[in-house]
Amino acid sequence: MIEATSCGGVVIHRGKILALYKSYKNRYEGWVLPKGTVEKGETHIQTALREVREEADVRASIVKYIGKSQYNFTVPEDMVTKEVHWYLMTADNYHSRPQKEEYFVDSGYYKFHEIYHLLRFSNEKQIVERAYQEYLEMRSTGLWGKQHKYY
């Protein structure tokens, strides 16, 4: 068995959540959150910010850590267990541009009820639900949007 670690972001701007549409030779299609593998020497925060920037061309800021998800998949002659660390993030605008080299063909910001139905994977739906609840709590107490640095 192979163990792998990735990091990603639930990016929210003005109440809408960033998602990417991936299409790889018609074998894999669906809306996903930006995430990717930790590179040597990187922290989880650095990985999450880099992946959001690379996959969606979004300058984001970390708000807080929101948890991790785990899933398994198979590769030829082995099983991979992947742990993904997720961060709630904010962006300073609605701009996004999908990374074609990674087979992303569309991207955009969607309302919670829209993205919840668009996302392909149930573990990402759960993370979005948790992140959105955090966002609503922070917004209601006036903490959302305070002192964020965009990377």
Give, region by region, the residue ranges found by the protein language model:
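N-terminal strand-loop-strand
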Residues: M1-L33
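Unchanged
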Residues: V38-Q126, K149-Y151
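A generic structural signal for ordered secondary structure
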Residues: G8, H13-L18, I45, Y65, ...
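Charged, low-complexity, helix/coiled-coil-prone segments
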Residues: M1, N26, G30-V32, K64-D78, ...
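Long, compositionally biased
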Residues: R139-Y151
